[in-house]
Amino acid sequence: MSGRMAVLLLMTCSVSRSDHSPLPKDPFADCLATDRARLKALARDAKSQPGPKRAKAQADFDALLERSRGIVAKRRERLPKPQFQEDLPVNGRRGEIAELIAKHQVVIVCGETGSGKTTQLPKICIELGRGATGYIGHTQPRRLAARSVASRVAQELQTQVGMGVGVKIRFHDKTIPESVIKLMTDGILLAETQTDPYLNAYDTIIIDEAHERSLNIDFLLGYLKQLLPKRPDLKVVVTSATIDAERFSQHFNGAPVIEVSGRLYPVEVRHRPVQTDDKDDERDLYEAIV
């Protein structure tokens, strides 16, 4: 699509329509999310400005559109090809999870400990083509968890922390513009709303362990609910224990919930017999316990 055609399509998007008529495709869907606001502003200028100003706005629009699409095309080509461990319970429902993420803006994933949701969900998002127009943001409640998850996901994607998988915690940022996944604490993402109120750096956000309900998580969930109508291209995945699934679904206006069982291992209990150093069978209670 040429720059002038994109301007014309943007102009038609502003025309009022009935609630049942289909919405046109976003003319900037293949551009970086961080560039879309600027592109829309330039498109308006190219329509309304007179004479030389209009020509300059059109030239700036065309240049930015070409640059942004080029970056997205390169990011899409460089997306990792994830491999999935079929023994993880979450991968048994990978197709269902991917379908829900593709169809809905918000998805609630309930998974018990050991289900693999923390490491596999960002890979499922990559498989869907997410991460091309912005980072796949992935929050953890604690700094240690963010670093360990980043290391594990990078290992599974055969890349390095600080390259394909970035991590950002307090006083420590190993993220580059070419990173696809960005691990961080929920406090870091909340702080970024001050400088990036529309979270344009991201095309997908995963809020992990949301059932912990810290202040940061609660603020983020409230903020995202207000943001989603303004960012229809943004996908949000919330993971939680089963106890809070319906509450999260109601918060996001009936978002679909999918449950994933945990992975259990057999536990064998053995009792070590009391052993004595001599043949004296009489021992006091304290020695027997110790």
Question: Which sequence ranges carry the predicted segments?
Answer:
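P-loop NTPase motor module signature
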Residues: 11-290
